[in-house]
Each structure stands twice: as C-alpha cells, then as structure tokens.
C-alpha cells in the first residue's frame, strides 16, 4: 500500500485531481476528511498543504506526493526526494522586486542591511548568500506586495506568473531567483521497496498517459481510395494511420490517425482539399 500526498487547496489542486481521475485513479472524498480512498485499495490519499508535502514525502509520512518545485527548494528537500515527473503546469517564478521609484534596478544595486519581505525565507536567504549579500529577511504569510509601501521592507521576494500583479502594485522585477512548476516526487526508500515502487510506477504511468494525450487528437475521416497514399503521407499517426473498408461504399476508405493538436487546423484543411469528408476530431483521454 502507498500513501499519495496531494495539495488540499490552491491553484494546482484541481488540475492534479482531474488528471488522476482521467488516469482512472478516482478519489472518493468525504467532506473535509484529510484522508481518502481511491478505486485502487492499495493507493490511499492524504490531503495536506502543498508547502508541507516535500517534508512529508522526504520523511516517509507519504510515499509519493505532488508539490511545487519552489516549495521543494524552500524546504531544502530537492536532493532528498526522487523527482519522478514535471507536470509542466503551475508555472511561476520566484523573483526579487522593488518599488517602481526605487534606485534598485538589478541585483547589483542591492546592498547589505536592506530588508526583504517574503514567504520563502529559506530559499531567499540561500540565494542571497550565494550572491554574497546579507539582508534582513522579514517572513510574511501573505500580501507580500504591500511590505515596501508600509515601511516593512525595501524589497520583496515573491512568486509571479505573468508579472501583472507586480505591475498593479507598482513593483518592478530586479532579479529572477528560480522558475517553478508542479512536480511528482517520491520517497527514496519507498522507491527501493519493490512493492511500493511498482505501485508508484503505476501512478506515474497513469499520469504520463494523460499528460501525453492532452497534446494529441484522434482524427477520423472517410477518404477516396485513390487519394489514400497522399492522405496517409500527411497524417502518419502513431505507427501509421489505420485504414479500413467501408462496407456500403467501395470507392471510399475509413482512415483514423493520432495527430498533434497544434497541427489540427492545417491538417483538416489539407484533408478537405484531397477529398476527405465526414472528418471528426476527437480529444483523447490517455495514451499508453
């Protein structure tokens, strides 16, 4: 049996749960319970704060978990965890920012003794030390952007996705500390246990199959027999397209193929020009 730690709230909680459900690992949640069953009796779920998950997995409280790379760095656990997968979403950057009217325009302008407010004191301190800087770190638990304007700090170190929030709060980015995405991580001892490792790999395989399918589409059509070679040349598919007879029409063939989502528009246009008809483009839930 393995215990999977998932964020109990926040921007990555919903998409992660949706991916697990598409992978076939439906979670039975009852009210505000901190633990839940899945359709697999050998996989149980624990809901926790995303910031606590790196330590829970490192310490063996959970066997595998989902968290942000920034939180792994903040808890200084990245070397102690087995990094299994980058979800490629939940993108954010931890940046140092200053008020727009500040004389600080880059990390070179930051001076020892300045105050910096952040929700990431550990990561911020280590980064500044690598830069040879000694700042007073003010730990906050939210609304970091206001700190320079109420005399709490000179700078902030905070997460940003697009930079819009910084601009709205009259702040400018002066240094990028780290880029972060959502990660699947495992306890190293659990990965050495054959039974637990096998179950963790099942979870990993399921997630990978959903993520891979998100960028693909199944395209189906009826096409003239004399155009099949031209059509199959523009939809190679995965191992080649599937071509089959249509019982009611001996001049047409049914063709199915998997293509990249970003090629759908161009491909459909080309197929129509070659005489394909009854074209269907369908989302795919999983590809194994």
Swiss-Prot record:
Pathway: Amino-acid biosynthesis; L-histidine biosynthesis; L-histidine from 5-phospho-alpha-D-ribose 1-diphosphate: step 1/9. GO terms for molecular function: ATP binding; ATP phosphoribosyltransferase activity; magnesium ion binding. Transmembrane segments: none annotated. The keyword Metal-binding applies. Signal peptide: none annotated. Pfam families: HisG (PF01634), HisG_C (PF08029). It is found in: Cytoplasm. Feedback inhibited by histidine. Its EC number is 2.4.2.17. One of its GO terms (cellular component) is cytoplasm. It catalyses: 1-(5-phospho-beta-D-ribosyl)-ATP + diphosphate = 5-phospho-alpha-D-ribose 1-diphosphate + ATP. It comes from the Archaea. Keywords: Amino-acid biosynthesis, ATP-binding, Cytoplasm, Glycosyltransferase, Histidine biosynthesis, Magnesium, Metal-binding, Nucleotide-binding, Transferase. Belongs to the ATP phosphoribosyltransferase family. Long subfamily. This is ATP phosphoribosyltransferase.
């Amino acid at each position: 049996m393995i215990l999977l730690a998932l964020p109990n709230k926040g921007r990555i909680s919903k998409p992660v749960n949706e991916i697990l459900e598409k992978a076939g690992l439906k979670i039975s949640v009852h009210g505000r319970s901190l633990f839940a069953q899945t359709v697999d009796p050998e996989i149980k779920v624990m809901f926790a704060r995303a910031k606590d998950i790196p330590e829970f997995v490192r310490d063996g409280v959970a066997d595998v978990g989902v968290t942000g790379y920034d939180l792994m760095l903040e808890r200084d656990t990245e070397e102690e965890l087995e990094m299994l997968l980058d979800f490629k979403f939940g993108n954010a950057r931890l940046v140092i920012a200053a008020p727009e009217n500040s004389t600080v325009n880059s990390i070179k302008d930051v001076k020892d003794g300045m105050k910096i407010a952040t929700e990431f004191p550990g990561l911020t301190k280590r980064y500044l030390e690598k830069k040879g800087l000694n700042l007073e770190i003010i730990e906050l638990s939210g609304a970091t952007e206001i700190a320079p304007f109420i005399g709490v700090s000179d700078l902030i170190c905070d997460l940003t996705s697009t930079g819009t929030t910084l601009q709205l709060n009259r702040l400018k980015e002066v240094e990028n500390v780290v880029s972060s995405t959502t990660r699947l991580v495992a306890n190293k001892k659990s990965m050495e246990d054959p039974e637990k490792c096998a179950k963790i790999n099942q979870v990993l395989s399921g997630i990978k199959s959903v993520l891979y399918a998100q960028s693909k589409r199944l395209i189906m059509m009826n096409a003239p027999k004399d155009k099949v070679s031209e059509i199959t040349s523009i939809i190679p598919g995965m191992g080649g397209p599937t071509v089959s007879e249509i019982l009611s029409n001996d001049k047409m063939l049914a063709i199915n193929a998997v293509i990249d989502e970003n090629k759908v528009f161009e491909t459909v246009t080309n197929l129509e020009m070659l005489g394909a008809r009854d074209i269907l483009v369908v989302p795919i839930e999983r590809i194994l």
